[in-house]
């Protein structure tokens, strides 16, 4: 049976439907009859307080009850309520009414919690269009990621005597070990080339103006190379593998030119090792870094921002699909984007130091082209 619905006009009422007791505008189905709020309240109070025995009519019970006269004769009004079919047994006493109200509130709260739980459990997964985007980005990464999943078998450890010992009488990371630096420069050109190739496999990147492409690549190159190294951190040997081939220790990377930046990359590697990222997640991180609309000098800011938003949404939905067993996985992973941006900024200032410390002929042309302003 429909319950009382005061406060709004229910959809089951016809437009301008009238109260069967007094003819005023009806508000709903009350105590088995279509009535107005006034007659509903009058009938409820009469029954709850047992007032009807005290009602008396001055005109022999023959009053006409309408919205003007309804308050003039309580007896005739009550008799009409009974005559049209209002049910006394449906009127609750105060204790039952409070219990019913409490039950309604509890049910409402339960529905609210159920809806919230449903939202939490049923996190959206990628749409068909997002799956297409995810596939493009993943294939771009796999095609440009040196050694792929076989990096552990293919890597070669940089000899321990290179770049391992701290430079005498120099602040930590202050001096550059030129032998280690020259080893790193051998792999820097192919590493940069792979980042460029990754970007060029993304249609949305290739559609941007050439000048914007250059700005985006110069901005993200160190960040993406650092990410690719960090996800190849090996806790057993405590090394990172650069460009999928050269395994180096923290000290070697530091003394070979990166200084304190090496600590940030190694710390990121240690942290990411617990995330168990797959190729798609690494690829999407790279795409988010690439499409950073806050790089100075860009002309297509809104377009790039829209691209990044598309990557982020697909990324979040993919994380939902993967169902990582880590609390707050998505926000924690997004923090790594901030860490990588910081690494890129630190490397920019470190590069100036390397220019002072290392002979110009040791710098590969592509290295200078990307990192010089």
Swiss-Prot record:
Gene3D superfamilies according to UniProt: Erythroid Transcription Factor GATA-1, subunit A (3.30.50.10), Retinoid X Receptor (1.10.565.10)
Biological process terms in GO annotation: cell differentiation; negative regulation of transcription by RNA polymerase II; positive regulation of transcription by RNA polymerase II; retinoic acid receptor signaling pathway; thyroid hormone receptor signaling pathway
Domain NR LBD, first and last residues per copy: 129-373
GO molecular function: nuclear receptor activity; RNA polymerase II cis-regulatory region sequence-specific DNA binding; thyroid hormone binding; zinc ion binding
PROSITE patterns for this protein: NR_LBD, NUCLEAR_REC_DBD_1, NUCLEAR_REC_DBD_2
DNA-binding residue intervals: 19-93
Binding site for 3,3',5-triiodo-L-thyronine: 194, 243
Residues that hold L-thyroxine according to the record: 194, 243, 347
InterPro entries on file: NHR-like_dom_sf (IPR035500), Nucl_hrmn_rcpt_lig-bd (IPR000536), Nuclear_hormone_rcpt_NR1 (IPR050234), Nuclear_hrmn_rcpt (IPR001723), ThyrH_rcpt (IPR001728), Znf_hrmn_rcpt (IPR001628), Znf_NHR/GATA (IPR013088)
Residues that hold Zn(2+) 2 according to the record: 57, 63, 73, 76
GO terms under cellular component: RNA polymerase II transcription regulator complex
ZnF start-end (NR C4-type): 19-39, 57-81
Amino acids binding 3,3',5-triiodo-L-thyronine 1: 347
UniProt-annotated stretches for the region Modulating: 1-18
Stimuli inducing this protein: By thyroid hormone.
Keywords: DNA-binding, Metal-binding, Nucleus, Receptor, Transcription, Transcription regulation, Zinc, Zinc-finger
Record keyword Transcription regulation present: yes
Pfam families noted in UniProt: Hormone_recep (PF00104), zf-C4 (PF00105)
Cellular compartments annotated: Nucleus
Domain of life: Eukaryota
Chief location category: nucleus
Domain comment in the entry: Composed of three domains: a modulating N-terminal domain, a DNA-binding domain and a C-terminal ligand-binding domain.
Record-linked PANTHER family: NUCLEAR HORMONE RECEPTOR (PTHR24082), THYROID HORMONE RECEPTOR BETA (PTHR24082:SF210)
Similarity section: Belongs to the nuclear hormone receptor family. NR1 subfamily.
Record's function text: Nuclear hormone receptor that can act as a repressor or activator of transcription. High affinity receptor for thyroid hormones, including triiodothyronine and thyroxine.
Protein name: Thyroid hormone receptor beta
Species name: Aquarana catesbeiana (American bullfrog)
Lineage: Eukaryota, Metazoa, Chordata, Craniata, Vertebrata
């Amino acid at each position: 049976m429909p319950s009382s619905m005061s406060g709004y006009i229910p959809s089951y009422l016809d437009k301008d439907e009238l109260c069967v007791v007094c003819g005023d505008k009806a508000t709903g189905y009350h105590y088995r009859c279509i009535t107005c709020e006034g007659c509903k309240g009058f009938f409820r109070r009469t029954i709850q307080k047992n007032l009807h025995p005290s009602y008396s009519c001055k005109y022999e019970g023959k009053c006409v009850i309408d919205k003007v006269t309804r308050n003039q004769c309580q007896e005739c009004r009550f008799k009409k309520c009974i005559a049209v079919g209002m049910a006394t047994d449906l009127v609750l006493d105060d204790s039952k009414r409070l219990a019913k109200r409490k039950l309604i509130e509890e049910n409402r709260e339960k529905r609210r919690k159920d809806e919230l739980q449903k939202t939490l459990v049923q996190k959206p997964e990628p749409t068909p269009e997002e799956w297409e985007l995810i596939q493009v980005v993943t294939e771009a990464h796999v095609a440009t990621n040196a050694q792929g999943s076989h990096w552990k078998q293919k890597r070669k450890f940089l000899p321990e005597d290179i770049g391992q010992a701290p430079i005498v009488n120099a602040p930590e990371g202050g001096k550059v070990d030129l032998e280690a630096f020259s080893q790193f420069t051998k792999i820097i050109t192919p590493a940069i080339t792979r980042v460029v190739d990754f970007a060029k496999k993304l249609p949305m990147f290739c559609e941007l103006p050439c000048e914007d492409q250059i700005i985006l690549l110069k901005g993200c190159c160190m960040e993406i190379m650092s990410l690719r190294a960090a996800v190849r951190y090996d806790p057993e040997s405590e090394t990172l593998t650069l460009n999928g081939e050269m395994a180096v220790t923290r000290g070697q990377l530091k003394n070979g030119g990166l200084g304190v930046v090496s600590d940030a990359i190694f710390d990121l590697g240690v942290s990411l090792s617990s995330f168990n990222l797959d190729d798609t997640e690494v690829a999407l991180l790279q795409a988010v870094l690439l499409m950073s609309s806050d790089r100075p000098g860009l002309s297509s800011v809104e377009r790039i921002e829209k691209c990044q938003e598309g990557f982020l949404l697909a990324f979040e939905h993919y994380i939902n699909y993967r169902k990582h067993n880590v609390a707050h996985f998505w926000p924690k992973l997004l923090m790594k984007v901030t860490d990588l941006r910081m690494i890129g900024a630190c490397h920019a200032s470190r590069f100036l130091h390397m220019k002072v410390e290392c002979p110009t002929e040791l710098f590969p042309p592509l290295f200078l082209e990307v990192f010089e302003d």
